[in-house]
Structure formats: structure tokens, C-alpha cells
């Protein structure tokens, strides 16, 4: 199938609720579950990862980044995917105003240690990079790019639209973002 980025910009909803973009938990949270050696490989073949996992185990990191053998790099790439998806969804909902009037992701914080999910804060209080991506997407004034997809290959033209999103009550001077 396609990417959520492609599907979302084709939809027109009055609100986007209970969505998410999965990402691995922080290394601190993962170490509360087991030693890194026990978590490898962090996929559906690992009993510990499955017992403490959610749909984040189905992240298509290999599709986007190739085969990753380094544990820290795998976590980083999985979290990057979550950042991109979460930020894109929040920005896309803002681009669809005034028709779309609400955007609310499924899970702000996670109440138990797991290998990954949609949360922005993982158990017990470890902030994931996606939290900051969503915070950036929710700034009052934002230059926002609507790119067509996440993956571009050599020779493809990157195609995107640029929006100036202004939810402040102030008129912005020319040239200020």
C-alpha cells in the first residue's frame, strides 16, 4: 500500500482523532524491560519484544532505511518515522482549516513499559522525539511543507507545497515566519 502521508492529504475530514504514528520507546524505557542483548532483534521474532510490544514492531524501517543491524540506529530510525508521521498529520489538519477543526492523537503518554507505540511520552516519563515534532507542528506561526510522500528515489522530483500557518491573532509582517 501507500504511505499515510499520501492518504491523509487526499482526505477531507472535520477532524482527525485517535490516529497515531508508531515509534520505538526510548532506550531508557527499553532497558526497563530487558537488557539490550535480550531485545535483539527488535522484531516479531523476539518473545520479549512481542510481549512488551505493540504495532510499533511492524514499523517498516527496512523499507525506508534498508537493513539496520545497529540497535541504537534502529531505535533512531523508528523514532524518526514517528516524528515525520505525527508532525505531518498535525500540520495537514491545520492546512485543512477551516473545514477540519480538531486534531488529537491517540496516546499522549504510555502507562506501562513497552517496546513502542503511538505515545509521545513513554513509561514512566521519558519524552520521545515525537513529542518535540508535534510541538513544532503546533507552533502558532509555522512555515509548513506538504510533500507528497516520505520516500523519494534518485532521479525523482521532490514535489511539495508551502503553507504559512498562522493561528495567532497577529498579522505577520512580510518576511517573518
What would you call each of these model-derived segments?
Residues 2-175:
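Substrate-binding clefts and catalytic carboxylate motifs of secreted carbohydrate-active enzymes
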Amino acid at each position: 500500500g501507500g504511505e499515510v502521508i499520501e492518504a491523509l492529504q487526499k482526505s477531507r475530514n472535520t477532524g482527525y482523532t485517535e490516529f497515531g504514528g508508531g515509534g520505538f520507546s526510548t532506550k531508557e524505557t527499553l532497558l526497563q524491560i530487558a537488557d539490550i542483548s535480550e531485545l535483539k532483534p527488535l522484531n516479531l521474532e523476539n518473545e520479549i519484544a512481542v510481549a512488551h510490544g505493540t504495532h510499533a514492531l511492524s514499523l517498516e524501517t527496512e523499507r525506508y532505511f534498508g537493513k539496520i543491524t545497529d540497535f541504537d540506529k534502529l531505535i533512531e530510525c523508528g523514532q524518526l518515522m514517528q516524528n515525520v508521521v505525527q508532525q505531518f498529520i498535525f500540520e495537514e489538519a491545520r492546512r485543512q482549516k477551516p473545514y477540519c477543526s480538531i486534531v488529537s492523537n491517540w496516546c499522549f503518554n504510555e502507562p506501562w513499559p513497552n517496546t513502542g507505540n503511538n505515545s509521545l511520552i513513554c513509561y514512566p516519563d521519558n519524552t520521545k522525539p515525537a513529542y518535540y515534532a508535534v510541538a513544532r507542528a503546533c507552533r502558532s506561526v509555522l512555515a509548513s511543507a506538504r510533500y507528497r510522500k516520505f520516500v523519494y528515489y534518485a532521479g525523482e522530483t521532490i514535489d511539495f507545497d508551502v503553507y504559512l500557518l498562522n493561528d495567532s491573532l497577529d498579522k505577520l509582517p512580510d518576511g517573518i515566519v
